[in-house]
Amino acid sequence: MLPDWINSECPAPSGAHRESALARQAQLTKPLGALGRLEEVAVELAALQAAEKPAAERVPVVLFAGDHGIAAQGVSAYPPEVTVQMLHNFAGGGAAIAVLAHSLGCPLEVVDVGTLADGQMRGVVVDKPRRGTRDFSVEQALTPADVAFVSEAGLRAVARQADHAPDLVIFGEMGIGNTTSAAAIAAALLACAPADIVGSGTGLDAEGRARKAKVIEDALTRHGLTAATPVAEVLAAVGGLEIIAMAGAIVAAAQRSWPVLVDGFIVSVAALVATRLNPSCRPWLLFSHRSAERGHAVVLDALGARPLIDLDLRLGEASGAATALPILRLACALHNGMATFAEAAVSGREA
């Protein structure tokens, strides 16, 4: 069901560069550890980039969009046509991630991997096996061929970013109903009750959240999904095209030794899928923020992740990762630019 490349081992981060970065941090004109997570992320980037001077300047953002048949069950506060309308907004520069990417100097690529849009759209790459998933409350969301195709779409999207020579990459998503698909995937893979995963998504009230959880619970039962179900079968049963594309893109980026700055709940579920398919990609993941979406904390815990910021964001679109990017840039600037005790003729800590 999934292509063979997705199992290929990802390179390991450079232990030598990690040790060198740690040694440099110990020599900078500050108490060791005084810059907290800024020190940690700089050291991690140095190891991932195998660089004496880590960087976070060249950062392409790739946004994957897809529609969801499950939206017919009233699991979103917005109608399905919003997905395609938002594609025009992304391409026109009016969406949050478009503004953030422009402000940060990040190239933005929008990829339609499965919206209901018919034909080409200006400013959007179209690479999809079908127009939307099927309603997984009544049938399989996708065929095995769909799952394979869209994972390859993630690989192709990563290949298109090579000309940017990325320091790291950011992936994002758009798709009405995709928090339902993400919650269903997470509930299956983690053996969690849907009620413990489901959040407000685009703004559901308590009644809407309960309905959403029941839809997922019934679907997991219908498809016989458990923690023992192979990942590819879970994806075919309840997956989303953009979620699978991001999982493929995460593995493909890690195989190229590109760090991935992971966004919120839905991208974290894609990261969970990626690590289940290829555990060697896990060291290449940096986690940007803790979303206000209820299930995000559960998924972060399963991944052993420590996000950088917590601003109650729940938009998606890679907006949280983009918001955290300046922190990575400042961490690199401090690591690379601060003087050592010797350079500044400042006395170091006494033994």
UniProtKB/Swiss-Prot annotation:
Keywords: Cobalamin biosynthesis, Glycosyltransferase, Transferase
InterPro entries recorded: Nict_dMeBzImd_PRibTrfase, Nict_dMeBzImd_PRibTrfase_bact, Nict_dMeBzImd_PRibTrfase_N, Nict_dMeBzImd_PRibTrfase_sf
Record: active site: 317
Gene Ontology MF term list: nicotinate-nucleotide-dimethylbenzimidazole phosphoribosyltransferase activity
Leader sequence segment: none
Transferase among keywords: yes
Known EC number: 2.4.2.21
Catalysed reaction, written as an equation: 5,6-dimethylbenzimidazole + nicotinate beta-D-ribonucleotide = alpha-ribazole 5'-phosphate + nicotinate + H(+)
Entry's Gene Ontology BP terms: cobalamin biosynthetic process
Function: Catalyzes the synthesis of alpha-ribazole-5'-phosphate from nicotinate mononucleotide (NAMN) and 5,6-dimethylbenzimidazole (DMB).
Family of this protein: Belongs to the CobT family.
Protein name in UniProt: Nicotinate-nucleotide--dimethylbenzimidazole phosphoribosyltransferase
